[in-house]
């Protein structure tokens, strides 16, 4: 089996690329970073530091790399069996034209073997969004062939891969936590379902997408925002602060009540899942910076993301949300010289006041009780 993976960054190398290579799949990375491409093609291998209670160093070998903006990547798309991505949500649109060209070439060469594409991004139904961009780049005459032969498979991914300062200045070395989860929608594949260790197949993907978004992402963000306010440097420092931990755990329990109501998750198993995530935040080997985790607060405060979406669920089912509201208030306080969205957020609050600013960012009704609760919490944490 041959696979092409867009994005040779830390998540690409440390998570998805590693799983594919470990499964014996012939893997080629596509990226724009020439230093990384040259290193991969010189060595065809790299090291992954898996950190947790039992630290280990794994070597990923037998890999190649091509530029994601040249003809080589188009040629590869015409022949591979699987395409995966870990490029970040905003970059999906940029790689779509190359994928479209490759699919046209595949059709022209008479390659009718099924191809599956899986976007492994921190977003809801990212592959469906990528499909839209690819279809926009195709001529009408090619769309029916693509619909018939190409599966666009949505997935949920979960592994903390912080930027790590390599002691050896090796551009390929990467550090990851022990935990990883890659869940894919088995109803969207074309052809036979792949058997890749570490890839879980489900016919109920949205339950797992929201479980991860409402628990890991919600908890991670609130830990970062409260941690920043309290002067902590890392996620570990923040979650070991009992006052922060109580709010984070409470928020995950509130969002969890929504999941249990919506999808029928087992309450005891979900409580154990929350405990596991709190343990991941405590990992002493991950130097996970609160500023990194908190960045892009406008996106994280938008209607479909990790703070407002679970809050909307609590409103839908008439459930408590006091800790989620505290997290939202802390997000509104996020300031960072490195992050344009943090600066935009600050300017918006200065210009419009917290009530109108939150309503604009989140889509919540400015006159609703929950916005008033958030504004009160915001003012209380000044």
Swiss-Prot record:
What EC number is given for this enzyme? 1.1.1.17
Q: Which PROSITE patterns match?
A: MANNITOL_DHGENASE
- Name a Pfam family for this protein: Mannitol_dh_C
**Which organism does this record belong to?**
Salmonella typhimurium (strain LT2 / SGSC1412 / ATCC 700720)
Q: Which InterPro entries match?
A: 6-PGluconate_DH-like_C_sf, 6PGD_dom2, Mannitol_1_phos_5_DH, Mannitol_DH, Mannitol_DH_C, Mannitol_DH_CS, Mannitol_DH_N, NAD(P)-bd_dom_sf
This protein's name: Mannitol-1-phosphate 5-dehydrogenase
Its UniProt entry gives the catalysed reaction(s) as: D-mannitol 1-phosphate + NAD(+) = beta-D-fructose 6-phosphate + NADH + H(+)
Enzyme class, spelled out: oxidoreductase
> One of this protein's GO BP terms?
mannitol catabolic process
- Any single Gene Ontology cellular-component annotation: cytosol
